[in-house]
From Swiss-Prot:
Homotetramer; although the tetramer contains four active sites, only two participate in the cleavage. Therefore, it should be considered as a dimer of dimers. GO terms for biological process: tRNA splicing, via endonucleolytic cleavage and ligation. InterPro entries: tRNA_endonuc-like_dom_sf, tRNA_intron_Endo_cat-like_sf, tRNA_intron_Endonuc_cat-like, tRNA_intron_Endonuc_N, tRNA_intron_Endonuc_N_sf, tRNA_splic, tRNA_splic_arch_short. Its EC number is 4.6.1.16. Pfam families: tRNA_int_endo, tRNA_int_endo_N. GO terms for cellular component: cytoplasm. It comes from Aeropyrum pernix (strain ATCC 700893 / DSM 11879 / JCM 9820 / NBRC 100138 / K1). Endonuclease that removes tRNA introns. Cleaves pre-tRNA at the 5'- and 3'-splice sites to release the intron. The products are an intron and two tRNA half-molecules bearing 2',3' cyclic phosphate and 5'-OH termini. Recognizes a pseudosymmetric substrate in which 2 bulged loops of 3 bases are separated by a stem of 4 bp. This is tRNA-splicing endonuclease.
Length: 186
């Protein structure tokens, strides 16, 4: 899975657009072995030292379910399989593209977190939050997207202001290509 250790098998409950892992040992394992999810009782965790449940995004949940690490159920206890998770996200037209990028980065050994606070799709770490700063912010595009040059300048300025490299991730089928921009001063 590209992680530093193998998390123990976990189970969670699908609630809205996330999966909640309530078993603390399972939650800690998922977080410590890849920084999956967000502990609900800690704003900025410094490791797996938390006592509450773990909230996983649907992207994280699908990835972990595909890897056989996470079993998902509905609140009534009925099982939610991998295909059911894919069906649950059909309302988001960008989900497939985002998931392909997420999976590709995870398989390359990166820790992938939400990039919302940076105005992008993902923040990508080499080691993990609290250990190092995310050197990259990644935004997903399809080959059909028209990118305004002003958007490129905006992305460059934003990434420079937060000391990160801005990466365009473009998906074609299941393949992902990356283009990184950086400031150049002659």
């Amino acid at each position: 899975m590209g992680d530093r250790c193998a998390p123990i098998k976990a189970s969670g409950v699908l609630i809205g657009d996330s999966v909640l892992v309530t078993d603390v040992e399972q939650a800690r394992s998922l977080y410590s072995c890849g920084y999956y999810g967000q502990p609900l009782d800690v704003e900025k965790p410094r490791g797996a030292d938390f006592e509450g449940p773990l909230r996983l995004s649907l992207i994280e949940s699908l990835y972990l379910a595909e890897k056989g690490v996470l079993e998902v159920a509905k609140p009534d206890g009925s099982s939610v399989g991998v295909e059911d998770l894919r069906t649950a996200v059909r309302g988001n037209p960008r989900f497939s593209m985002l998931y392909n990028i997420y999976r590709d980065l995870r398989e390359r050994g990166f820790v992938v977190r939400s990039g919302l606070k940076f105005g992008s799709d993902f923040a990508v770490y080499r080691l993990g939050p609290g250990i190092d700063h995310a050197p990259f912010i990644v935004h997903a595009y399809s080959p059909e997207d028209n990118i305004d040059p002003v958007e490129i300048v905006r992305a460059g300025r934003l990434s420079h202001s937060v000391r990160k490299k801005f990466v365009f991730a473009v998906t074609r089928g299941g393949d992902v290509s990356y283009l990184m921009i950086d400031w150049f001063r002659p």
